[in-house]
Curated annotation (Swiss-Prot):
Organism: Arabidopsis thaliana
Gene it is expressed from: ISPE
Induction conditions: Circadian-regulated with a peak in the late period of the light phase.
UniProt cross-references to SUPFAM superfamilies, sorted A to Z: GHMP Kinase, C-terminal domain, Ribosomal protein S5 domain 2-like
Biochemical pathway: Isoprenoid biosynthesis; isopentenyl diphosphate biosynthesis via DXP pathway; isopentenyl diphosphate from 1-deoxy-D-xylulose 5-phosphate: step 3/6
Lineage of the species this protein comes from: Eukaryota, Viridiplantae, Streptophyta, Embryophyta, Tracheophyta
Record's protein name: 4-diphosphocytidyl-2-C-methyl-D-erythritol kinase, chloroplastic
Highest rank taxon of the organism: Eukaryota
Function of the protein: Enzyme of the plastid non-mevalonate pathway for isoprenoid biosynthesis that catalyzes the phosphorylation of the position 2 hydroxy group of 4-diphosphocytidyl-2C-methyl-D-erythritol. Is essential for chloroplast development.
């Protein structure tokens, strides 16, 4: 797996107000506990810094309601890839119709929830800069949605340990929202069903309902129509994710999309082929690649170089969602030029594999954290 050279520790974003209460207790700097993990390969090292507020969150949850059967919760929030993505038309509401095979993968964030003494506001903190911690964040939107639908008056303190980069086409924010809905339901004693959570979630994001599948699904409409599927691939099939520092604006990608230049392959044919034959380059069609490559020409060059340098090591190389992550399925390792070329010194790298979940359980965190990058700056700055 790709690992990184020893970086300096960059500043973590943190909202101190998130840890103030009306009681005599207050936030202590001792709660900032950088966790360092090192691994070495090809003379490179990885340093991962994670803000860990466990002690504070645990105390708050216990103090709020000692009788509550569950007062705090730690959940894995995995991202997804689009194995294929067809854009089939434009709707009257301005959205596009799509048909896509979504699959959850083992790269993800960790979110910690605790009951809050507040009766009016959720408090969110995170370990990276550039991620909003107010009502713009999908986690807060999801919690507000849950209270609106159920009448619950419970609020939460949340810490988001972010590993999935933003602007990557991986659905990290959508996964966070789905995870928050699941957590709110658990911390309220399971007031509603999974199906209800899934139905509600489409009100705040088209990709969110997918995460209430079992991990693999054929999604249509805006993405909110979810047909659960059995896993079409071995779950241990490895892949590598390579995301350049530049992000693709989803709005700009769709603005440059020309429906007369999209693939003419029936998405149901793609689904049948991938189910029967597994992953191949011909199956991993993404109609958003041409407009994304127009927005970010270096992304097209990156994909071409990975295919050329892989020498058959990857079963397929393709872009996920609206970009800017390029996926290579079949190997967890990036091509050597990613290490050698100065142009790619700040890319985000992660190995991953497919994953699913059991009914009435959330996604389980993998035994090891696989995300890594080739610099501290790209590791810590997700803007």
């Amino acid at each position: 797996m790709a690992t990184a050279s020893p970086p300096f520790i960059s500043t973590l974003s943190f909202t101190h107000s998130s840890f103030k209460t009306s009681s005599s207790s207050s936030f202590s700097p001792k709660l900032l506990r950088p966790l360092l993990s090192f691994s070495v390969k090809a003379s490179r090292k990885q340093v991962e810094i994670v803000f860990d507020p466990d002690e504070r969150l645990n105390k708050i949850g216990d103090d709020v309601d000692k009788e509550a059967p569950l007062s705090r919760l730690k959940l894995f929030s995995p991202c997804k890839i689009n194995v294929f993505l067809r854009i089939t038309g434009k709707r009257e509401d301005g959205f596009h119709d799509l048909a896509s095979l979504f699959h959850v993968i083992s790269l993800g964030d960790t979110i910690k929830f605790s009951l809050s003494p507040s009766k009016s506001k959720d408090r969110l903190s995170t370990n990276v800069q550039g991620v909003p911690v107010d009502g713009r964040n999908l986690i807060i939107k999801a919690l507000n949605l849950y209270r609106k639908k159920t009448g619950s008056n419970r609020f939460f303190w949340i810490h988001l340990d972010k590993k999935v980069p933003t602007g990557a086409g991986l659905g990290g924010g959508s996964s966070n929202a789905a995870t928050a809905l699941w957590a709110a339901n658990e911390l309220n004693g399971g007031l509603v069903t999974e199906n209800e959570l899934q139905d509600w979630s489409s009100e705040i994001g088209s990709d969110i309902p997918f995460f209430f599948s079992h991990g693999a699904a054929y999604c249509t409409g805006r993405g909110e129509i979810v047909q659960d599927l059995p896993p079409p691939f071995p779950l241990d099939l490895p892949m590598v994710l390579i995301k350049p520092r530049e992000a693709c604006s989803t709005a700009e990608v769709y603005k440059r999309l020309r429906l007369d230049q999209t693939s003419n392959i029936n998405p149901l044919t793609l689904l049948e082929n991938v189910t029967s034959n597994g992953v191949s380059q011909s199956i991993c069609v993404n109609d958003l690649e041409p407009p994304a490559f127009s927005v970010l020409p270096s992304l097209k060059r990156l994909k071409q170089r990975i295919i050329a340098s892989g020498r058959g090591e990857y079963d397929a190389v393709f872009m996920s969602g609206s970009g800017s992550t390029i996926i290579g399925i079949g190997s967890p390792d990036p091509p050597q030029f990613i290490y050698d070329d100065e142009e790619y010194k700040n890319v985000f790298l992660s190995e991953a594999n497919f994953m699913t979940r059991e009914a009435n359980e959330w996604y389980k965190e993998p035994a090891s954290a696989n995300a890594t990058t080739s610099s501290a700056e790209s590791r810590m700055d997700f803007q």
